[in-house]
């Protein structure tokens, strides 16, 4: 807590950081609902009496000629900082193949770390959003047009095209930072059977 001009501001430190990487920002209503719903499956890791999940959004379209180069560059820079500092451990991805090929960040679903030439094996590192009963069962409501989204619709339908994965820890420093996220990952993927490899 710090004081500023006679007012007190309570700074909230999230227990978990979850990254969303996609060509466009998710609607604000979807992000807010997602943060609240994800928190129900986490623990109070920092002991402040509440469970807080922060969604970090990074916009980039891998291997797309139609994408906004400036947005992509800004998103790439922010994502690189996130990965290097082990900020986010769980990733919600629109294009897991492009993400893994670019970052080499994800681990296998069975917990093993992939070798450096295993990026094309990405489908063994993610679940489809729709593979996970816990995720599809979340009450995420609907979104209306806002600053980032011109359309309106159902948040679950929007996320049905996404995948979810967890990053690997190759260094001791990142391993300790990621340790808190293991129970959350286990809770979110409970009962999931991956269909990401179908068609490969």
Regions found by a protein language model. Name each.
Residues 1-2:
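Short, small-residue-biased leader/transition segments that mark boundaries at the very start
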Residues 15-25:
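Short, well-ordered beta-strand elements
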Residues 24-27, 96-100, 170-171:
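Solvent-exposed loop/turn segments at secondary-structure junctions
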Residues 28-52:
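Short, polar/charged alpha-helical segment
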Residues 45-62, 68-69:
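Acidic, glycine-anchored loop motifs typical of Ca2+
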Residues 73-133:
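Extracytoplasmic "Venus flytrap"/periplasmic binding protein-like
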Residues 106-175:
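A structural signal for short loop-to-beta-strand junctions that line the ligand-binding cleft
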Residues 176-198:
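Surface-exposed amphipathic alpha-helical segments
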């Amino acid at each position: 807590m710090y004081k500023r001009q006679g007012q007190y501001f309570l700074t909230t430190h999230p227990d978990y950081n979850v990254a969303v990487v996609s060509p466009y920002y998710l609607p604000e209503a979807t992000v807010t609902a997602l943060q609240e719903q994800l928190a129900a499956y986490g623990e109070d890791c920092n002991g402040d009496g509440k469970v807080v999940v922060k969604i970090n959004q990074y916009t980039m379209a891998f291997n797309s000629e139609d994408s906004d180069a400036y947005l992509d560059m800004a998103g790439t820079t922010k994502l690189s900082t996130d990965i290097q500092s082990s900020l986010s451990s769980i990733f919600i991805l629109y294009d897991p193949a492009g993400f893994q090929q670019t970052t080499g960040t994800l681990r296998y679903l069975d917990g093993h770390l992939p070798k450096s030439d295993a990026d094309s094996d990405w489908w063994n590192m993610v679940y489809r959003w729709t593979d996970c009963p816990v995720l599809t069962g979340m009450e995420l409501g609907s979104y209306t047009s806002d600053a980032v989204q011109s359309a309106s619709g159902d948040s679950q339908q929007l996320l049905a095209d996404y995948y979810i994965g967890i990053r690997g820890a190759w260094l001791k420093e990142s391993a300790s930072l990621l340790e808190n996220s293991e129970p959350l990952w286990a809770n979110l993927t409970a009962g999931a059977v991956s269909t990401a490899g179908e068609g490969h």
